[in-house]
Regions:
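Acidic-enriched, low-complexity/disordered segments with a strong bias for Aspartate over Glutamate
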Residues: 1, 10, 15, 22-24, ...
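NAD(P)-dependent short-chain dehydrogenase/reductase
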Residues: 74-75, 98-166
Length: 167
């Protein structure tokens, strides 16, 4: 909630904030749209409002997602590529991206960001494909299952390593 976030920022007095918190599952965003939008966008605007009124010197980093471009036909996406969100998750990330640009420009806040493409980490839950594969292979190896079921495998997606993105 915004009050708690603002109290923490006020107490800690950071020089920099790196915000990696949000609801990050595209499928879930369709099931719980208000929660997804609130945690991904409204919470960020609450932080921006705090920075605007209390401490414009804090440097702020906000990642967003390539999902905000939707199923683009472009071979190479750029910051000025057309936004075409196709899920609540992508809509929330698009809104956060635009809010970051607006607060930076209009209110002279130090806000920078990065457009992240798909990335994986050991912390991912078993619902994500790389963890499904790892868990499935382990289950087959240990005799718990006879085959690996993935579902739709038509997607063409590149992945990066989350730690590399953060560094």
């Amino acid at each position: 909630d915004g009050i708690s976030i603002n109290n923490i920022i006020d107490k800690v007095k950071p020089d920099e904030i790196y915000n990696f918190a949000d609801q990050d599952h595209v499928g879930w965003s369709q099931d719980i749209p208000l929660y997804s939008y609130s945690t991904t966008t409204l919470s960020v605007i609450q932080i921006f409002e705090f920075l605007k009124s209390k401490n414009k010197k804090i440097k702020y980093f906000q990642p967003v997602s390539s999902n905000m471009f939707g199923l683009s036909e472009e071979n190479s996406l750029k910051e000025d590529s057309i936004l075409s969100p196709a899920s609540v998750y992508a809509l929330a990330k698009s809104s956060t991206y635009l809010a970051s640009k607006m607060y930076s420009t209009i209110h002279n806040l130090f806000i920078c960001g990065a457009i992240f493409f798909n990335h994986e980490s050991p912390r991912r839950s078993d619902e994500y494909v790389t963890k499904k594969i790892i868990k499935g292979v382990c289950d087959i190896y240990n005799g718990k299952k006879d085959f690996l079921y993935l579902g739709d495998i038509s997607a063409k997606i590149d992945w990066g390593y989350a730690k590399d993105y953060v560094e």
